Amino acid sequence: MAHIPSGGAPAAGAAPMGPQYCVCKVELSVSGQNLLDRDVTSKSDPFCVLFTENNGRWIEYDRTETAINNLNPAFSKKFVLDYHFEEVQKLKFALFDQDKSSMRLDEHDFLGQFSCSLGTIVSSKKITRPLLLLNDKPAGKGLITIAAQELSDNRVITLSLAGRRLDKKDLFGKSDPFLEFYKPGDDGKWMLVHRTEVIKYTLDPVWKPFTVPLVSLCDGDMEKPIQVMCYDYDNDGGHDFIGEFQTSVSQMCEARDSVPLEFECINPKKQRKKKNYKNSGIIILRSCKINRDYSFLDYILGGCQLMFTVGIDFTASNGNPLDPSSLHYINPMGTNEYLSAIWAVGQIIQDYDSDKMFPALGFGAQLPPDWKVSHEFAINFNPTNPFCSGVDGIAQAYSACLPHIRFYGPTNFSPIVNHVARFAAQATQQRTATQYFILLIITDGVISDMEETRHAVVQASKLPMSIIIVGVGNADFAAMEFLDGDSRMLRSHTGEEAARDIVQFVPFREFRNAAKETLAKAVLAELPQQVVQYFKHKNLPPTNSEPA
């Protein structure tokens, strides 16, 4: 989105000013219970150290204050971290009994530690876990409790404004008025926050309602002064000043649809020169509404679970899994492109599902005992319970099923898309933002049932569901790009348009020589936005959300 620099000329219909993105920060609060008592004459004096993992090494990130003589501390110092959904952010919390004033940790008694990912904490909002010693044995009865909170003001303010009897500035016409909104900057100068569009040839303009983040308009401070300037637009950039007034968000909140607020637009020069000067027109605030613009993290902290399903392509084009040239051949390192894709996506998403039980389905193979082709079978051969325990369970079931099936065809996606869509449709009956379904399809080739798949994806776009397709091997994946509606919205063969873009396609070959984290980032890049987009469209707030 283009922004007009401060002092530049606003085009008619200019875009809103201010940041259009949210830097997501998470605050972690830590407390301990029943900590080991390392002091002889008194209780321990614990403090907590947070370590983050960087290239396999633990790096100290921050530490809390020391709680004197306390085996059940609640630390007031918080840990603040940037949150990245598409990464596994490993954390280690270590507690020590302070013995000296030294900053060196080896000079303090170790009380226990706990390691997990940031995603694990965020998905539960609050966790309590046993502390472990360096030999992984329990640190007595010691426990650690970690609570997560998003550090962002997600409120947005929507203003609807008009003008009445503004000063005429053009010699042969009326005025072309627009408004600018300013807030006080840290340097004491006024900082431009928003500029409205220009309304041509009128002294009684009605501007389009606009929405800006509350933190952009007033830093979240409802009493902070806001300066509003009214100008007559000139093509040469020398806009003529009409007048100004000051207000605050708390004052503007008094405006309602039935009771507008009116502000006199004052030109100080005219006010000083003319004794009978009244004003240079009236600015009318027709309505002021504050709402919450919920983020992906709001929904996760609100208890939304990500329901993960894997669909694996077992068609003959993959090659015999015993042949090293086959895409299903498991190399001496115990992996292949299918397993790499499962790990890359699954290790992120499994942190956001409390029971970590994931259905794993296959398609395009002949199954024993009658060797009929199936496009929707449980790879653990248990159709009533296709669930695998975590990503490890999916990998084990995948490896175990390979010798027992015959690769066949064709490459039909629609049965598995419809399978997950049925569960997503059931979840909508709850009318809450508690479940969102993610289908990972890993395939080596061209879709055989493109019309049926297009129809299935268009129908799924109305549900709490996203589809990630990872293409393995070196086939032509042009059809997959067609399903990924980044450039244009997908339509079914009947002409029905998808409600939103829910497909993300990534060719594995582009990541063969990259770090494994790179694939996860690319594959999951659009998912948070898709989750938020769906729940917003359905007007479903996070389950524990506060009113604005």
UniProtKB/Swiss-Prot annotation:
Its cofactor is Ca(2+). SUPFAM superfamilies: C2 domain (Calcium/lipid-binding domain, CaLB), vWA-like. InterPro entries: C2_dom (IPR000008), C2_domain_sf (IPR035892), C2B_Copine (IPR037768), Copine (IPR045052), Copine_C (IPR010734), VWF_A (IPR002035), vWFA_dom_sf (IPR036465). Gene3D superfamilies: C2 domain (2.60.40.150). GO terms for molecular function: calcium-dependent phospholipid binding; metal ion binding. It comes from Homo sapiens. Its main location: cytoplasm. Ca(2+) 4 binds at D170, D176, D232, D234. Expressed in the brain. Expressed in neutrophil precursors from the bone marrow and peripheral blood. Residues 5-131, 138-263 form the C2 domain. Pfam families: C2, Copine. Ca(2+) 3 binds at D99, S102, D109. Keywords: Calcium, Cell membrane, Cytoplasm, Membrane, Metal-binding, Nucleus, Repeat. The C2 domain 2, but not the C2 domain 1, is necessary for calcium-mediated membrane association. The linker region is necessary for calcium-dependent cell membrane association. This is Copine-2. Calcium-dependent phospholipid-binding protein that plays a role in calcium-mediated intracellular processes. Exhibits calcium-dependent cell membrane binding properties. The keyword Zinc-finger does not apply. Binds 3 Ca(2+) ions per C2 domain. Ca(2+) 5 binds at D170, D232, D234, D240.
